């Protein structure tokens, strides 16, 4: 059996028992699963500045949450985010952010979204479920390479000393080596700021590999 096939089979088993099974069980009772997830987030952040202001410690249900927490926009959250950007802890999240994801949104003004370890854990769970289903449906997909487009995760640093940039670049840079071996592109291409050059190198580099996944 090829080394890639051994890795693929091992990965599929790990994904199945780590996240895929739990996700499939949650789909049988999605309302309950979503409420449990919401309440776990509330409990984890109940002693933050935002959590204290909105009485997270008293929230026991979705209705409690709706009554305690107003509908927000980025503008209404900006004062909290600004303090987090300056390195003040426990404002929005109990976890210290690893970085800030940036997006221009619809206004053109840069928006900074705190990326915490617990968020990355949840984000990874979704990727794991997707990857498991892909491996189950296309058993030879990882005999080739994956063309993963990402941008730099370090475009600059906040006043608090944390990097800001693209979360896709952070994930590409921090993947384990046994996952990176399936990537068609080296991380260094992600850091190129000149868009036309970056995409040319992405296409040119991928031509040398058996790309089976975009």
Located regions from the model:
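Active-site phosphate/ATP/adenylate-binding loop shared across adenylate-forming ligases
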Residues: 1-33, 38-55, 59-214
